[in-house]
Amino acid sequence: MLEIIIGNLCSLLGMGLDSYSSTKKTKKEILFIQNISLFVYGTGSIFLKGYSASAQNYVGIIRNVVATNEKSPKWAHWFLIALGVVMGLIFNNLGFVGLLPIIANLEYSIAIFTIKDNDKLLKICFLINVLLFAIFCLFIYNFVGVITNSIVIISCLINIIKKES
């Protein structure tokens, strides 16, 4: 029971950071805040025994650092995407449900490395990522994750719509 509480508290902190990241205007700012949240999520997922998600979160930190370096070689981008998939599959202890974080990370990693100067599209891709993680959270008893993912989804939608007007 203590593991569930700690994991849920980590999710609460991570989601607060993600909500905050959706208010940022540049890719560098968005990814910096998301790196902190990825570390917190990875730690929380260990407590909740969602190991494929932990692997995705920790690889995601490296991915974001590389993504903010405009001079990083393209092979490094694709290597990190492949590393995320491989590590997720190795640490998947939940069958199909354990694939959700892998798919989410794959989708968002490709977005980060291929989307240039389109913060709206990056936020939409992040929205898809958060939705997949919300479903995953249901299965690992991360109740805070489900609730706060829903809040982040709403926050992202508001910021995407606000940018339109």
Question: PLM ranges: what are they?
Answer:
Residues 1-165:
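Alpha-helical membrane-protein topology signature
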